[in-house]
Swiss-Prot record:
One Gene Ontology term from the biological process aspect of the record: bone development
Positions of post-translational Phosphoserine modification: 52, 77, 106
General function of this protein: Component of the ribosome, a large ribonucleoprotein complex responsible for the synthesis of proteins in the cell. The small ribosomal subunit (SSU) binds messenger RNAs (mRNAs) and translates the encoded message by selecting cognate aminoacyl-transfer RNA (tRNA) molecules. The large subunit (LSU) contains the ribosomal catalytic site termed the peptidyl transferase center (PTC), which catalyzes the formation of peptide bonds, thereby polymerizing the amino acids delivered by tRNAs into a polypeptide chain.
Disease: Spondyloepimetaphyseal dysplasia, Isidor-Toutain type: An autosomal dominant bone disease characterized by early postnatal growth deficiency, severe short stature, genu varum, platyspondyly and severe epiphyseal and metaphyseal changes in the lower limbs.
Subcellular location: Cytoplasm
Protein name per Swiss-Prot or TrEMBL: Large ribosomal subunit protein eL13
Main location: cytoplasm
GO CC terms in record: cytoplasm; cytosol; cytosolic large ribosomal subunit; cytosolic ribosome; endoplasmic reticulum; membrane; nucleolus; nucleus
Family: Belongs to the eukaryotic ribosomal protein eL13 family.
Length: 211
């Protein structure tokens, strides 16, 4: 294989009858068929639940490089479920993924996922455990007739881009230093506690000097 990208140029040392140790990939097409059959079998087994599994939350990708994009996460946090009014044990039984390790670090993410849960709950057709004795919250007989298995992801997460109209760049925007501003904001956030502590100590020393 030809070297790709900025990696080290390899010097392969072929000894010990290397032709018998070549990694082959002849099972690839059969493995593809096997995966497809497994997906179809699972879809039949869990019908009429969605074939792609439970609903996932909207999360932001980590690091500065990717945090402008959103994607589907692992599971909803316990706080999101509490605000949406869904018990964590009930959530898993009605096709909602739960991740107790996740923490909400912003109000926006919390509100977005709570709204997502409420929308999902409004669209959900819930089958009664006993058809003869439906409980509160179960769907009506008319709604049950409309139920079909969803094949794609449940409420897929999409990145929405808002196009801006072309306009003249202002002088203020030309003089604005984006990178320096971000670095300064990060430095201020990092040093906030240390600066507050130093200011408090300086104030205490001034009080002692006045005495």
């Amino acid at each position: 294989m030809a070297p790709s990208r900025n990696g080290m140029v390899l010097k392969p040392h072929f000894h010990k009858d290397w032709q018998r140790r070549v990694a082959t990939w002849f099972n690839q097409p059969a493995r593809k068929i096997r995966r497809r059959k497994a997906r179809q079998a699972k879809a039949r087994r869990i019908a009429p639940r969605p074939a792609s599994g439970p609903i996932r939350p909207i999360v932001r990708c980590p690091t500065v490089r990717y945090h402008t994009k959103v994607r589907a996460g692992r599971g909803f946090s316990l706080e999101e479920l509490r605000v949406a009014g869904i018990h964590k044990k009930v959530a898993r039984t009605i096709g909602i993924s739960v991740d107790p390790r996740r923490r909400n670090k912003s109000t926006e993410s919390l509100q977005a996922n709570v709204q997502r849960l409420k929308e999902y709950r409004s669209k959900l057709i819930l089958f009664p455990r006993k058809p003869s004795a439906p409980k509160k919250g179960d769907s009506s007989a008319e709604e049950l007739k409309l139920a079909t298995q969803l094949t794609g992801p449940v409420m897929p997460v999409r990145n929405v881009y808002k196009k801006e109209k072309a306009r003249v760049i202002t002088e203020e925007e030309k003089n604005f230093k984006a990178f320096a501003s971000l670095r300064m904001a990060r430095a201020n956030a990092r040093l906030f506690g240390i600066r507050a502590k130093r200011a408090k100590e300086a104030a205490e020393q001034d009080v002692e000097k006045k005495k």
